[in-house]
């Protein structure tokens, strides 16, 4: 039943249900499919689901490519409705990756930089987040491909074209200090596809 869709993301919720995000065919939760319905503002905003993330309060966040960030909210009939975020303030519609840091802050990688927020605050006020990108001098590329939290709680951000960045929030997340690593520091390519740490503290970086 999945094989006719291009699968981009898989996650498991706290009930043991599998969530499957596809390119062009929406989101499958358990046995139910969820897709964009133009007449229903509580439906999925976009059928391209590129990332799924379960936060420490077991909320399920959905990154769409074209419709921004979604929060799945259960309904009384056992189904889900979706709240939409990040589109209004900066028009952040292209979401590739979602990660959480040790402080419970959510980091969202978009085509316009990294968006950081506390989930409780964003739910209360959809404009309560910080955006870091090339425009405000944080990264050399706005296109974020991956985000990884290492065993020391440090956040690594991989970009498309400007390498790898080790990021450290400052001033209560109002600014972001970073160290940049690119081809001049030994990377084969500045397009970062994936990041993973091993049990020895090494960081493995996949590039183009």
Where are these regions (language model features)?
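Carboxylate-rich, polar loop motifs that coordinate divalent cations or form catalytic acidic clusters
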Residues: 1-208
